Amino acid sequence: MAVNKLKAPRNIHIDFSPSPRQYELWKLLQPNYCPHCGAEIEQVLVGYDQQRNPQYKPQCKHCKSQNLPQLILGGGAAGGGKSYVGSVWLVSSCMRFENIRAVVARKTLKSLKESTWNTIKTILKDWGLKEDVNYKINNLEGTLTFWNDSVIIMKEMADIPSDPNFERFGSSEYTIAMVDEVSEISEKSVE
């Protein structure tokens, strides 16, 4: 059990009924689903880098396809539920897997706190999770930590003249990320 004294929820009710278009996006976000045949995904050793670290690539166990999404973009008009589906994906991934380091990002922290962050907190409440029991929020650090040590981290993606290469992110390692309103930020910030 995690040392943070939080507890796994019991008897939670997850109410998620995506529209057909939302469901298409949701299917692509599943880490163990091949969009071609529906089979399970495995990580296959493809070689080693210069420091002799193993390099893996996802591959379908059944059809052997390596043409699997690594970057998924959802588009459409306002009100289509893209932010909601992305928020459900972050929360459900953190609940499903321990030690996930998930990022939710937007151009400014202010706009993130006023929108997507509220959506994430609403999902947690709607699913019956309790703050300081199943998860805790650190508003100063901009983190939401689950009982299993998975964490959602808020990040600002604005271009800052004093940091044109986004060195403020350093060697940060994240498992998954969702950038809301990606059209508002530069391509370099996404890289």
Identify what each model region corresponds to.
Residues M1-E191:
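Short, flexible loop motifs at catalytic/binding sites
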